[in-house]
């Protein structure tokens, strides 16, 4: 009572001293005054507040000072929340008394109060005083929106808005009833979401509430709550008006309810970033796939940052309240500047439909004086654990009915969880709490069965592996092994050197280059390189050795020469280790040959090949190479580097140590001295400086392989032997061995700046005496990529990139070289397209992988030149080559006019296919028929330049059917065809008489319906592998304009009618 009297006295004194109090702020937070002052200041700066309003704001601050002098806070409501003595109502009565004494000369605009119930009380008095109330907390007025016209609300939330949003969500999910869950107690602002929502629905009857569950957080039996919820509707609507939201959600069990296929909906009166921002609450909601209905606050984080400029210590749960206070004070100015003064009717009219723009965004009033609020339905984004909008509903003003002056316009932003409507409803046992969860039992059974299956698979694989070990697949029988000694090796070597010296064409020299072998082995029909020892006694291999040799036999890699096996324990008393023979040359020969231009392309490709093969070995069960030298790096015919003699050095050392074998006395040194000093010091054995005995086999290890890689890379970069000992095979230098072992001696590296210096520094790291400090293969690969950035991939890839590089360089040259550039580009693409079909070549060039595939129907044709061997005997090689080039070029010209592809030419045979890789919808048979007729016409008129009397005769056969095709080969890819259709077409050609085009009856019938082709029935022909086949000859294409003469025909005996040619009889 004393408080009310003080307020009356203070207001009366201010009335006598000042022009009047216009703005009264109800709030119990000290920062509210700053926010309100900020709003008035911003409105003034934006020209939305009158000079009189500014004076009134200053008068408000004066009243605040007077209140403080009397020991009374400037906020009329002194209580926290909405409990205790109702001071707001007391203050309202006091102000009413002052207003009565001043006979209406004192006008008021009320902002607030915090309690929603008190807004109704203040609003009722304001109706009498004709003073407007700007509320910033949501109010549900059961009497209707037109019954409280003195209240203008900026709360940006309404019970009707969330109710209509819920109705729309229910329609989308095809639900007609809900279970409503809320707190018995109200929120600090006096709002009870669940009670107001139920009251609204009782009036509007928008949906059916099957169960209404009120929860008293201080005294609750959660078991009963759980049973009541499960007996209710499938859609459970939880109003988040709890003091401890996490505990309430956890005890309600929203995650388990979601597991029972209930639909969880959470309703908030503020944005989720403010109420549900705790990580544990987010995790709980994400696990339940809950929908969250709340007001939509655009750019929440930006607005929060702006508010922190006014209130530095702003808490997460205070933002919306202060934002509403700001909007209320700002609206006070906007109403005043529009001439509304402080009269209720004028203020209400001025603000209806008004759009107000502030630094926090724009808000618009409807016709009832309430702010139009947009709503959203959120879910939890699992990737970032943030709130993601899946549905927004925009409020649009409309003519007011009893409770709403707006309608919602929905917009779906995601279809993430709308599939919930297709899920089955909860089981009946859920409501009875009688469900039995069999999932743990099923999981346990699955785990046990899986363990048993895995154990069985492991046991079977181990047993099968053990059986394979004892099959001795690596053992080469002596009967299939034959050693071939090349007695003319020295003479061949001399001729090879002379050819290299005399051949100035580097490309031709590289193509023709071959190794000269003193001897080699034949394993069956396959040639192999070998290392042979004299066997002293029979060797008993333990199981570990058998397993090792079996694993060695199973190795398969593009950069490894195949390990054939070992011949051992035979009566010839030798042990022979065999690998695939690679003919072109060793890396050592190429490195030391100064005439060979080893540019960055070759270096990078060979280095990568070495590391790829070595990486495969290190990751396999073999684990090492052991004999890695430039001489054991072999270059094959396709310029692919392959490693040989891998994984056997430790095996050979063990047998030598056990004296089971020995090096033959007359055999050449297995390891030359220049190779010996390039092995890692930790594996070098003592060397016989007398030179009478060859070095022992050196053991190997993965770290030792890295040391040898450094030596090989040094040789490739410097193009010389690391220790300049290439001619020191006969007399070793024992001093050098001791320097390497004891003085850390290593190859000399100059200080000259070069691009490859980084690689040489990496070589020095490879030679570190501590094996653990040597670089890894991955690091070596990275160094190669750094040193040779433009050389990547294998040689085929690099050749393509080199062509593109050269093309780019040529384009920048002067006009005189433009023609050369175009020619180089044309030749590059022509060569590529000769190897592969154009579409396949293009895809491979773009780095795509071309998997093999099958074609339902395609046509394959073979053309063979008759009497080719006789022609070769009476012609020189140059004349034969010129003839083949000439005739095949004419054939190629025919192919280019049709949808077909030349697969390959082999001697006198020419192979064509249509329908692959480009499927032409059945046109392939007609394309090949046309090609065959045109090629035969060429043969009729062809004149051989060096033999004018020679008559060219050809055999043509084709067949249509299913086919398989794919790119074979990685280093030298070719597009190959497979299948019975290819074999059948080949048989048609081989069984065909000269100057005829032969096909089977099955293929001929594909051309019958066109009525454009004339066939002759040959009859039954015995075809190898096919049996008796009814064959036809294709004679001509019946064109409309003219009919070309029939080709000459060679009578062939027919099994059905001898000496006759039977016209085709269509079925």
UniProtKB/Swiss-Prot annotation:
Annotated binding of ATP, by residue: 515-523, 534
UniProt family annotation: Belongs to the adenylyl cyclase class-4/guanylyl cyclase family.
Lineage: Eukaryota, Metazoa, Ecdysozoa, Nematoda, Chromadorea
Transmembrane regions listed in the UniProt entry: 439-459
Membrane topology classification: Single-pass type I membrane protein
Protein name: Receptor-type guanylate cyclase gcy-10
Extracellular side: 21-438
Annotated Protein kinase domain residues: 509-791
Sequence ranges on the Cytoplasmic membrane side: 460-1067
Cellular component aspect of the GO annotation: non-motile cilium; plasma membrane
Glycan-modified residues: 411
Enzyme class: lyase
GO MF terms, alphabetically ordered: ATP binding; GTP binding; guanylate cyclase activity; peptide receptor activity; protein kinase activity
Organism: Caenorhabditis elegans
UniProt remark on domains: The extracellular domain may not be directly implicated in the detection of volatile odorants. The protein kinase domain is predicted to be catalytically inactive.
Reactions catalysed, as given in the entry: GTP = 3',5'-cyclic GMP + diphosphate
A Pfam family the protein falls into: Pkinase
EC number from the UniProt entry: 4.6.1.2
Reported tissue expression: Expressed predominantly in AWC but also in AWB, ASI, ASJ and ASK sensory neurons and in I1 interneuron.
Matching InterPro entries: A/G_cyclase, Cyclic_nucleotide_synthase, Kinase-like_dom_sf, Nucleotide_cyclase, Peripla_BP_I, Prot_kinase_dom
Source superkingdom: Eukaryota
Known function: Guanylate cyclase involved in the production of the second messenger cGMP. Regulates chemotaxis responses toward volatile odorants in AWC sensory neurons and their avoidance in AWB sensory neurons. May be involved in sensitivity to quinine by regulating egl-4 activity through the production of cGMP. Involved in phototransduction in ASJ neurons downstream of G protein coupled-photoreceptor lite-1. Required to maintain the expression of putative olfactory receptor str-2 in AWC neurons in adults.
Membrane among keywords: yes
Record CDD domains: CHD, PBP1_NPR_GC-like, PK_GC
């Amino acid at each position: 009572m004393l408080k009310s009297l003080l307020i009356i006295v203070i207001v009366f004194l201010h009335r006598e001293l000042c022009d009047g109090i216009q703005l009264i702020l109800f709030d119990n937070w000290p920062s509210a005054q700053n926010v309100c002052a900020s709003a008035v200041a911003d409105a003034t700066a934006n020209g939305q507040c009158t000079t009189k309003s500014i004076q009134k704001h200053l008068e408000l601050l004066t009243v605040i000072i007077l209140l403080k002098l009397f020991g009374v806070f400037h906020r009329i409501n002194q209580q926290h929340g909405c409990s205790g003595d109702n001071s707001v109502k007391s203050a309202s009565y006091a102000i009413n008394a002052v207003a009565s004494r001043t006979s209406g000369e004192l006008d008021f605009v009320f902002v607030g109060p915090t309690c929603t119930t008190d807004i109704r009380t203040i609003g009722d008095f304001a109706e009498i005083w004709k003073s407007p109330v700007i509320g910033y907390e949501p109010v549900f007025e059961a009497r209707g929106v037109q019954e409280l016209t003195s209240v203008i609300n900026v709360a940006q939330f309404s019970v009707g808005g969330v109710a209509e949003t819920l109705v729309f969500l229910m329609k989308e999910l095809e639900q007609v009833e809900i279970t409503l869950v809320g707190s018995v107690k109200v929120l600090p602002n006096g709002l009870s979401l669940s009670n107001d929502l139920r009251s609204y629905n009782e009036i509007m009857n928008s949906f059916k509430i099957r169960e209404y569950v009120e929860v008293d957080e201080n005294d609750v039996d959660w078991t009963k709550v759980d049973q009541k919820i499960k007996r209710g509707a499938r859609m459970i609507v939880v109003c988040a008006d709890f003091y401890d939201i996490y505990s309430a959600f956890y005890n309600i069990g929203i995650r388990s309810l979601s597991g029972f296929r209930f639909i969880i909906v959470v309703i908030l009166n503020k944005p989720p970033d403010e109420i549900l921002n705790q990580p544990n609450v987010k995790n709980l909601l994400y696990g339940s796939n809950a929908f969250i209905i709340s007001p939509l606050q655009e750019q929440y984080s930006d607005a929060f940052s702006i508010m922190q400029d006014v209130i530095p210590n702003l808490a997460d749960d205070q933002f919306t309240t202060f934002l509403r206070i700001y909007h209320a004070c700002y609206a006070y100015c906007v109403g005043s500047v529009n001439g509304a003064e402080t009269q209720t009717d004028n203020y209400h009219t001025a603000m209806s439909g008004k759009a107000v723009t502030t630094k926090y965004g724009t808000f618009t009033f409807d016709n009832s004086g309430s702010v139009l609020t947009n709503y959203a339905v959120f879910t939890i984004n699992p990737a970032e654990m943030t709130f993601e909008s899946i549905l927004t509903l925009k409020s649009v003003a409309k003519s007011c009915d009893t409770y709403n002056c707006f309608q919602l316009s929905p917009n779906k932003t995601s279809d993430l969880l709308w599939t919930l409507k297709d899920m089955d409803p909860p089981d009946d046992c859920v409501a009875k709490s009688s469900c039995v969860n069999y999932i743990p039992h099923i999981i346990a059974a699955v785990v046990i069965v899986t363990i048993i299956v895995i154990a069985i698979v492991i046991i079977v694989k181990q047993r099968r592996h053990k059986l394979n070990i004892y099959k001795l697949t690596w053992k080469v029988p002596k009967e299939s092994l034959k050693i071939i000694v090349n007695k003319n090796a020295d003479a061949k070597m001399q001729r090879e050197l002379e050819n290299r010296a005399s051949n100035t064409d580097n490309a031709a020299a590289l193509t023709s280059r071959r190794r000269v072998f003193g001897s080699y082995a034949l394993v069956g029909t396959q040639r192999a390189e070998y290392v042979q020892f004299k066997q002293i006694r029979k060797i008993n291999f333990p199981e570990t050795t058998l397993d090792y040799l079996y694993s060695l036999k199973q190795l398969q890699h593009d950069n490894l020469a195949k390990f054939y096996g070992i011949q051992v324990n035979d009566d010839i008393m030798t042990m022979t280790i065999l690998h695939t023979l690679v003919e072109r040359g060793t890396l050592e020969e190429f490195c030391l040959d100064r005439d060979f231009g080893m540019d960055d392309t070759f270096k990078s490709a060979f280095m990568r090949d070495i590391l790829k093969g070595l990486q495969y070995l290190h990751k396999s069960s073999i684990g090492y190479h052991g004999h890695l030298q430039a001489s054991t790096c072999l270059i094959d015919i396709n310029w692919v580097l392959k490693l040989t003699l891998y994984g056997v050095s430790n095996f050979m050392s063990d047998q030598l140590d056990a004296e089971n074998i020995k090096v033959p006395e007359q055999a050449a040194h297995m390891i030359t001295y220049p190779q010996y000093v390039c092995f890692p010091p930790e594996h070098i054995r003592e060397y016989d400086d007398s030179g009478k005995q060859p070095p022992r086999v050196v053991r190997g290890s993965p770290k030792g392989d890295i040391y040898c890689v450094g030596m090989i890379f040094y040789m490739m970069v410097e193009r010389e032997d690391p220790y300049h000992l290439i001619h020191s095979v006969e007399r070793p230098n024992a001093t050098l061995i001791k320097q390497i072992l004891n003085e850390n001696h290593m190859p000399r590296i100059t200080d000259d700046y070069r691009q490859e210096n980084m690689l040489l520094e990496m070589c020095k790291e490879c030679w570190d005496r501590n094996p653990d400090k040597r670089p890894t293969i991955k690091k070596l690969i990275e160094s190669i990529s750094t040193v040779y950035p433009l050389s990547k991939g294998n040689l085929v890839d690099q050749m393509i990139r080199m062509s593109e590089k050269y093309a780019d360089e040529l384009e920048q040259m002067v006009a005189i070289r433009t023609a050369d550039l175009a020619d180089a580009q044309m030749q590059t693409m022509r060569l590529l397209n000769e190897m592969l079909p154009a579409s396949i070549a293009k895809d491979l060039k773009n780095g795509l992988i071309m998997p093999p595939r099958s074609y339902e129907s395609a046509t394959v044709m073979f053309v063979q030149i008759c009497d080719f061997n006789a022609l070769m005997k009476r012609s020189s090689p140059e004349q034969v080559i010129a003839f083949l080039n000439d005739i095949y070029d004419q054939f190629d010209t025919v192919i280019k006019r049709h949808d077909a592809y030349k697969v390959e030419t082999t001697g006198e045979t020419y192979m064509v296919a249509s329908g692959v890789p480009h499927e032409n919808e059945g046109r392939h048979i007609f394309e090949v028929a046309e090609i065959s007729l045109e090629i035969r016409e060429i043969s009729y008129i062809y004149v051989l330049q060096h033999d004018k009397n020679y008559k060219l005769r050809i055999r043509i056969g084709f067949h249509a059917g299913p086919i398989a095709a794919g790119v074979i080969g990685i280093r030298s890819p070719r597009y190959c065809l497979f299948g019975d259709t290819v074999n059948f077409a080949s048989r048609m050609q081989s069984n065909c008489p000269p100057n005829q085009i032969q096909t089977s009856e099955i293929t001929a019938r594909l051309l019958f319906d066109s009525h454009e082709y004339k066939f002759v029935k040959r009859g039954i022909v015995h075809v190898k592998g096919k049996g008796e086949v009814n064959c036809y000859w294709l004679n001509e294409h019946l064109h409309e304009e003219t009919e070309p003469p029939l080709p000459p025909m060679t009578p062939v005996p027919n099994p059905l009618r001898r000496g006759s040619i039977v016209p085709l009889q269509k079925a």
